[in-house]
Design a protein with these regions (language model features):
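C-terminal output helix
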Residues: 101, 118-129
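Two-component/phosphorelay signaling modules centered on CheY-like receiver
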Residues: 22-42
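Conserved phosphotransfer microenvironments
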Residues: 64-80
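Acidic, metal-coordinating helix/loop segments flanking the phosphotransfer/catalytic sites
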Residues: 43-61, 124
Length: 140
């Protein structure tokens, strides 16, 4: 009996961290490192560099700060949602001060979670990657 093995490599998932604070970049990188599925990490400090990264690479998950030097993360998620190629990428909006206005934009753009940076952890990453439908989740 002859057997065949599939030697094709499964592409490794890649997380794009869009955050201008080096300290918060490190925190998010540590959280990704503790998740069950190991991922490559790419970091963008601005929305402009995030756009370039999204054009050049396949991204599996986006961790997005709301206040960036060249724009607002909550507005950027609307841009992502309008792009058919990018709309299916799970997004977690990680902010110092989530506001009701941010929740509204996040929900309309299909963001998985809006999380305070102090509360952000592995469970959000694993749940976002495990969900098949993009949706915003928040406490009522």
């Amino acid at each position: 009996m002859q057997t065949h093995s599939d030697n094709r490599q499964i592409p490794q998932a890649t997380c794009l961290i869009i955050e201008d604070s080096p300290l918060d970049q490190q925190m998010m990188t540590r959280v990704i490192g503790r998740s069950q599925g190991k991922m490559q990490i790419r970091v963008a400090c601005t929305l402009q560099s995030a756009r370039a990264t999204l054009l050049a690479h396949d991204i599996s998950l986006i961790l997005l700060d709301n206040n960036l030097p060249d724009g607002i993360g909550a507005n950027f998620v609307l841009e992502l949602a309008a792009d058919q190629r990018l709309a299916s990428i799970p997004v977690i909006l990680v902010s110092d001060w989530p506001t009701p206005f941010m929740w509204e934009k996040a929900a309309s753009a299909g963001v998985r979670y809006v999380v305070n940076k102090a509360e952000f952890g592995v469970r959000y990453v694993e749940q976002a990657l495990g969900q098949g439908i993009r949706r915003a989740v928040h406490a009522s």
